[in-house]
């Protein structure tokens, strides 16, 4: 088998100079389901449990969230865009990720999905009210599909800087002095999840929620065994959407890796990063620009060690673009920026990580010694 040929002298193909010149080989995963149950419109919010809501709120404000609602037991965070909240944090004994909630395109989709899986529809106590159906993906992660009755109104934006570019000067007799303040979050962009059952979990999101793949990554020398990472977007037809709303990758763990939140521009990322650093928070990796998705990025750890990303200027794809295919490597994570850190890759050795690997290798899943060695090679290449 050989790669799909690309004619450098002809018109651009969907993979030439767009996101990957390598399309699928014959018989490889198509990256979408023919007849999904529904097609979700976007991520709605992410749900966490934490013991200290006061500390969580301090970080949230420093990171750039606005507070949508606060009770003794719940903290709802939001961005400036109109719509649903970005995050729900419930008070609990331990810090843990509870799962994502996806936004249904219309209320009838919640009922249709509930009927298809045999689950009930329930009211949800979200600002503005709404309805939801609760599911589990093949990894065992709780997933909700929701429809909010009343969207939150928009909040004031952090305006982008007016830039002088080449022969198009737009700013004269004025200086650039962006204030040292939090990067004002606009919206939730995506969540990245790790799973030991990559193939089954991927197919579940495509079959059940109607999502489609933008890019596949595969391990060196193991392409014939299928991909080990997928960047997945929502299918809204001709309407351009984020390159990925969800990313899945094979690994020894199960659950949350990081989540990403859009801000105005590069200066908002940089100044917000300075603000976080001055307050003693840990940068995990950044600032740089990704390859898959093209986002400008900056990754930070919250006080509970969860990783969150500020991003701007990401790719937008319509439903027409077919998946790209590329080898997985640490050096392939960014077009430019500082070297990727061990903290970001999760490769720092620890007793907990060793137990996680041993448990995965003994279990009935897709992580075998060859896959593990391939992942280790990718993270060092």
Task: State where each predicted segment sits.
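The feature marks the first
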Residues: 26-120, 124, 129, 365-381
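Non-heme Fe(II) oxygenase catalytic core, chiefly the N-lobe of the double-stranded beta-helix
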Residues: 153, 161-206, 216-218, 224
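Active-site beta-strand termini and strand-to-loop segments that position acidic
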Residues: 77-82, 91, 135-138, 232-236, ...
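Core segments of cupin and vicinal oxygen chelate
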Residues: 2-17, 38-84, 193-241
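Short beta-strand/turn micro-motifs at beta-sheet edges
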Residues: 32-35, 87-88, 177-180, 244-249
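Vicinal oxygen chelate
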Residues: 1-34, 41-51, 91-115, 118-184, 230-231, 280-381, ...
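Structured core of small recognition/catalytic domains
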Residues: 199-288, 295, 303-304
């Amino acid at each position: 088998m050989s790669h799909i040929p690309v004619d450098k002298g002809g018109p651009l193909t969907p993979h030439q100079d767009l996101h990957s010149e390598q399309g699928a080989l014959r018989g490889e995963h198509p990256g979408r389901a023919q007849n999904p149950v529904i097609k979700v419109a976007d991520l709605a919010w992410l749900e966490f449990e934490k013991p200290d809501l006061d500390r969580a709120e301090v970080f949230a404000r420093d990171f750039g969230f606005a507070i949508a609602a606060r009770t003794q037991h719940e903290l709802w965070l939001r961005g400036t865009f109109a719509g649903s909240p970005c995050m729900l944090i419930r008070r609990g004994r331990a810090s843990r990720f509870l799962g994502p909630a996806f936004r249904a395109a219309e209320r009838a989709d919640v009922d249709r999905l509930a009927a298809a899986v045999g689950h009930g529809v329930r009211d949800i106590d979200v600002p503005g009210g709404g309805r939801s159906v609760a599911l589990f993906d093949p990894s065992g992660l709780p997933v909700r599909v929701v429809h909010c009755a009343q969207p939150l109104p928009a909040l004031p934006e952090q305006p982008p800087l007016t830039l002088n570019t080449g022969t198009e000067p737009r700013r004269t007799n004025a200086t650039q002095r962006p204030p040292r303040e939090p990067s004002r979050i606009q919206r939730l962009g995506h969540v990245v999840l790790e799973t030991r059952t990559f193939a089954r979990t991927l197919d579940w999101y495509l079959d059940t929620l109607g999502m489609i793949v933008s890019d596949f990554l595969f391990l060196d020398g193991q392409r014939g065994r299928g991909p080990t990472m997928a960047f997945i977007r929502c299918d809204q037809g001709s309407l351009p959407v984020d390159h990925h709303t969800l990313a899945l990758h094979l690994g020894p763990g199960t659950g949350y890796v990081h989540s990403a939140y859009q801000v105005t521009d590069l200066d908002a990322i940089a100044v917000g990063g300075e603000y976080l650093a001055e307050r003693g928070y840990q940068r995990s990796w950044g600032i740089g620009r990704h390859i898959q998705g093209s986002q400008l990025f900056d990754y930070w750890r919250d006080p509970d060690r969860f990783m969150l990303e500020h991003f701007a200027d990401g790719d937008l794809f319509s439903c027409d673009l077919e998946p790209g295919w590329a080898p997985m490597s640490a050096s392939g994570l960014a077009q430019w920026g500082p070297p990727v850190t061990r903290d970001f890759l999760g490769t720092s050795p620890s007793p907990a990580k060793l137990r996680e690997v041993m448990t995965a290798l003994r279990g009935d899943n897709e992580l075998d010694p060859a896959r593990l060695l391939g992942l280790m090679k990718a993270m060092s290449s």
